[in-house]
Amino acid sequence: NLDTLMKMFADMGNNPSFSQHMNNQLQKPIPIIKRIEITLEQVYSGCMVPIEITRNIKQSGVVREETETLYVEVAKGVDTNEIIVFREKGHIVDDSPGGDIKVFVSVLDHAHFKRSGLDLIYTKQISLKDVLCGVDFEFEHVSGKLYKINNTKGQTIIYPGYKKIVPGLGLQRQEHVGNLLIEFEITFPEKLNTNQIDT
């Protein structure tokens, strides 16, 4: 009956040799650690990254190596130090559960963009003349598309620390989407000549 079965398992759990046997059977080998570096463009679109791993397979005291190429599925919006796990794809010791493979992600710095969570930050340097007379410029987004920003004279007052927010042009993580923040850095001249003052 149920009471008899429960007592039997309890007795097994109190038996040191049985407990040691179960621990040996269930203890997983140490994980295989891999690291991948990806670009911000890959973060934006998601990607598959191939990695080559070498696992040890120990059976009946004999150890052999096995090499395999795995493909890491990197989701959109992933960040540095996130870990992607391949469960039980690592080292194998007899009948114990296979060890894991842990892949640490590192996102490389971008030449033009920084990230803040899911937001992308683009810094644009402009002159005082651009502030007063208007400015337009193009830039290449991490999606590969070209975007044009046009701020005509008097449309928006650009001041030190001003940020233009473009909704939906940030990174995506599942149903969450960030924005693009364009930060304007104004370069002020040390002095103005007569022509500049008249202009």
What are the language-model segments listed below?
Residues 1-64, 71, 94:
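Post-J-domain flank of DnaJ/Hsp40 co-chaperones
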Residues 53-56, 64-199:
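Intrinsically disordered, low-complexity linker/assembly segments
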